[in-house]
Design a protein with these regions (language model features):
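Acidic, low-complexity intrinsically disordered segments
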Residues: 1-135
Length: 135
């Protein structure tokens, strides 16, 4: 990271969106994760809490993640809720994420008729010097 030596710090935010709001049982819900104003992003993560009666996690489709490793975790909490933790990290020296782009798609299957109201929380962007920017 020569970039980080100049005192540059990680910036930006991630937003999630779906093509529509209502999904029928067994329909695939594609949640687009878009980055805006990204600077020096070497790792990213956020939480997406969901009700396992509503959704089943199918997978992640990387779009603009360069050489980042997908370390996403789908976790069942003791209170019965589930949270998906989409997480991508550069292992070793790889190009950081910059600018504005569609980063990846989270694929969920609707287990019954649902209105998509999930929100990303606890978002973190990290640079090569481990500076953290929350969103």
């Amino acid at each position: 990271g020569a970039d980080a030596v100049r005192g540059e710090k990680v910036e930006g935010k991630l937003d999630i969106s779906t093509p529509k709001q209502t999904y029928a049982k067994d329909e695939l819900v594609e949640v687009l994760v878009k980055g805006t104003g990204l600077r020096f992003v070497n790792a990213l993560s956020f939480a997406l809490a969901y009700d396992p009666a509503d959704y089943e996690f199918v997978g992640i489709q990387p779009l603009g993640m360069k050489n980042m490793e997908n370390l996403t975790n789908d976790r069942l909490h003791t209170n019965g809720t589930k949270s998906l933790y989409p997480t991508f990290v550069n292992i070793g020296e790889h190009e950081s994420l910059e600018g504005e782009s569609n980063l990846f798609v989270i694929k969920l299957k609707a287990k019954r008729k649902v209105s998509f109201k999930l929100t990303a929380t606890d978002g973190y962007l990290v640079d090569k010097l481990l500076n953290v920017h929350t969103f």
